[in-house]
């Protein structure tokens, strides 16, 4: 289970995205899930402003904007997760996806 207090999203030993730079949106998820699927906001969207991030060096920012340019809208990367019935699990899945995507984009 995830820790309730997170100082940030660790991408690598040299890069952690501060929690304050991560924004969340919640909505109802579609698909199976029983009665709760229509009443619980279990779908999550994690937004991170890569273009304006204070965590990145200029080189890292340039590489991310170049490699993830097709996924960015006005410099903001959005990750959606709705595969789990619980919002907390979807939040964790979105965080893991963001970390993986950014780490892959920063690889030489």
Feature annotation, model-predicted:
Residues 1-108:
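Ribosome-associated translation termination/rescue signal centered on the conserved GGQ peptidyl-tRNA hydrolysis loop
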């Amino acid at each position: 289970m995830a820790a309730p207090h997170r100082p940030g999203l660790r991408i690598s030993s040299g890069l952690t995205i501060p929690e304050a730079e991560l924004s969340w949106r919640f909505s109802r998820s579609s698909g199976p899930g029983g009665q709760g699927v229509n009443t619980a906001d279990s779908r999550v969207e994690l937004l991170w402003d890569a273009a304006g991030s204070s965590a990145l060096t200029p080189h890292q920012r340039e590489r991310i904007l170049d490699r993830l340019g097709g996924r960015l809208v006005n410099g903001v990367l959005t990750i959606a997760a709705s595969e789990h019935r619980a919002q907390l699990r979807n939040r964790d899945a979105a965080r893991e996806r963001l970390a993986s995507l950014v780490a892959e984009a920063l690889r030489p």
